[in-house]
A protein has these predicted regions:
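Interfacial helix-cap and linker-helix signal at transmembrane-aqueous boundaries
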Residues: 42-44, 74-76, 107, 156-169
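Extracytoplasmic
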Residues: 12-71, 121-122, 126
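Small-residue-rich transmembrane alpha-helices and their cytosolic helix-loop interfaces
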Residues: 25, 57, 61, 140-155
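Small-residue-rich segments within alpha-helical transmembrane domains of MFS-like 12-TM solute carriers
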Residues: 29, 33, 99, 115-123, ...
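Helix-loop-helix hairpin linking two adjacent transmembrane segments in secondary transporters
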Residues: 146-192, 203-216
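Conserved MFS/SLC helix-loop-helix module at the cytosolic interface between two early adjacent transmembrane helices
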Residues: 65-104
Length: 220
């Protein structure tokens, strides 16, 4: 297959299109429901236990794991632009709500939703540049490159969260990610057009949503 990114307008240089999606993938990977780098400040300000904040991380991972099984169904149903913009908007709202003093069960549910949007945005970015990274679809090449993005984002998001918490306030990390999501929305609104990966839209019928809710309750 020949690599192309038809979701971009024709005036966007082809050489920078995949790099833009790598930047967007980093933006999504920097997001989290709560940031453990600022755990001490959150525990002190909210008067909660460390385990309560750690549970936010587990809830985010639960959302990512549960939503992973429907990523391709979503890709075959909605346009690339719609998936990325909706993911960015959901993460933006989750980041803002996470700075409020919500009841812990509600905060954990918010982190689940944030995790779903995080993996949706990352998957949509990386799946569109897979042929650029490895024209033969060699997963021995693709996954190491993907893991570079994931591991760098994990390390630097934790570092940034700790730096913001020490120098300013822990909420600034959430504001920073909100700015990143605005960047994603701006790129998608200004540089791309609706593009569907499939010649025919595949409906969402047949997905066991109730089973997903039960598994989520079991994991949490």
């Amino acid at each position: 297959m020949v690599f192309s990114m038809p979701m971009f307008y024709d005036w966007i240089p082809r050489c920078i299109r995949p790099w833009l999606y790598i930047v967007l993938a980093f933006c999504f990977q920097f997001s989290n429901g709560m940031y453990l780098g600022a755990m001490n400040q959150v525990v002190g300000q909210w008067a909660v236990m460390r385990e309560d904040v750690q549970m936010c991380l587990y809830a985010t991972l639960t959302g990512m794991a549960l939503y992973f099984v429907v990523l391709f169904r979503m890709k075959f149903r909605f346009t690339n632009q719609k998936l990325l913009m909706s993911s960015a908007l959901i993460i933006f709202l989750c980041q803002w709500l996470a700075t409020l003093r919500l009841p812990l069960p509600l905060l954990w549910g918010l982190c689940v939703v944030c995790g779903m949007a995080k993996i949706q945005g990352t998957f949509e970015c990386m799946s569109n540049i897979q042929l650029w990274m490895t024209p033969k679809r060699d997963f021995g090449v693709f996954f190491p490159l993907l893991h570079i993005i994931l591991l760098v984002s994990i390390e630097y998001s934790g570092f940034l969260a700790a730096w913001f918490a020490y120098e300013m306030h822990w909420e600034y990390m959430h504001y920073f990610v909100m700015l990143l999501m605005l960047l994603v929305l701006l790129v998608q609104a200004a540089l791309t057009r609706p593009f569907h990966a499939m010649p025919k839209i595949v409906p969402l019928r047949g997905i066991d949503w109730l089973g997903g809710v039960i598994w989520m309750a079991l994991f949490l």
